[in-house]
Curated annotation (Swiss-Prot):
UniProt keywords, alphabetically: Hydrolase, Magnesium, Metal-binding, Schiff base
UniProt lineage: Bacteria, Pseudomonadati, Pseudomonadota, Gammaproteobacteria, Enterobacterales
Organism field: Salmonella gallinarum (strain 287/91 / NCTC 13346)
Cofactor binding annotation: Binds 1 Mg(2+) ion per subunit.
Subunit organization: Homodimer.
Name of this chain's protein: Phosphonoacetaldehyde hydrolase
HAMAP family reported for this sequence: PhnX (MF_01375)
EC number: 3.11.1.1
Similarity field: Belongs to the HAD-like hydrolase superfamily. PhnX family.
InterPro entries in UniProt: HAD-like_hydrolase_sf, HAD-like_sf, HAD-SF_hydro_IA, HAD_sf, PGP-like_dom2, Phosphonoacetald_hydro
Length: 270
């Protein structure tokens, strides 16, 4: 029984809650507008997803199109003080609204129950800072999602993604004996990098999250052709980041775990 998966470490928005990862992306658009009356698109807001939120704003400012808009308005590129101001606008908006995006994605509760029935522990980490997570975690618990541990992007002095530290903090907290017995699941490329840097198996989610970028209602009414195109776009980004597996959503994870267990039994490692 030792040579098998002992823990999965799950992202939050777009992986376990908030189908399409809209809570953070919409707030970035609002924060840029509120702080400096600068417009960014939802697609631009999605590009650096997975970073801590201050670093996410910094990365947005470096996108060529956003930098061009900033230069046109202010005659210079975004400064650290500008990032601080946008972050200061972002935080209260995100804290106020994250609870509205706390419902588990379809299949999450059943999948977690199935994993726990196999003795698998449930860790989690997020690009959200602790102030946001302290609102999101209890709200998700009210809907039935309660991981065994969670780590926020600003909890650790070493930093957040794409570094391995949040994933490894879960390993420590959960008492897992080997990182090769862990699976990191994420809907964003940086979360896949995090898992790889931590020495874990990685599973990307192509439909439920940031790269697919649709609401649940929009997904339900989308044509098969549109779904296929968007799925392929998302999957290609996740595979390019190094994901060992890519599936649509967490509802598909149990079969992947069985496949990884078979590989572990044959002596394979991530």
């Amino acid at each position: 029984m030792m040579n098998r998966i002992h823990a999965v470490i799950l992202d939050w928005a777009g992986t376990t809650v908030d189908f399409g990862s809209f809570a953070p992306t919409q707030i970035f658009v609002e924060a840029f507008r509120q702080a400096f009356d600068v417009e960014i698109t939802l697609a631009e807001a999605r590009v650096p997803m997975g970073l801590g939120k201050w670093q996410h704003i910094e990365a947005l400012g470096k996108l060529p199109a956003v930098d061009a808009r900033w230069q046109a308005k202010f005659g210079r590129s975004m400064s650290a003080a500008d990032i601080d101001a946008i972050y200061a606008a972002f935080m209260p908006l995100q804290i106020a609204k994250v609870v509205d995006f706390s419902s588990p994605i379809a299949g999450v509760i059943d999948t977690i129950a199935a994993l726990r029935a196999e003795g698998i522990k449930i860790g989690s980490c997020s690009g959200y800072p602790r102030a946001v997570m302290e609102r999101l975690v209890p709200a998700a618990a009210e809907h039935g999602y309660r991981p065994d541990h969670w780590v926020a992007t600003d909890d650790l002095a070493a930093g957040g993604r794409p570094g391995p530290w949040m994933a490894l903090q879960n390993v420590i907290a959960l008492g897992i004996d080997a990182v090769a017995h862990c699976v990191k699941v994420d809907d964003a490329a940086l979360g896949i990098s995090e898992g790889l840097n931590a020495g874990m198996w990685t599973v990307g989610l192509a439909v439920s999250g940031n790269e697919f970028g649709a609401t649940w209602d929009a997904y339900q009414t989308m044509s098969k052709e549109d779904v296929a195109v968007r799925r392929e776009h998302a999957a290609s980004k996740l595979y390019a980041a190094g994901a060992h597996y890519v599936v649509d959503s967490l509802a598909d994870l149990s079969g992947v775990i069985a496949h990884i267990n078979a590989r572990l039994a044959q002596g394979e490692r991530p």
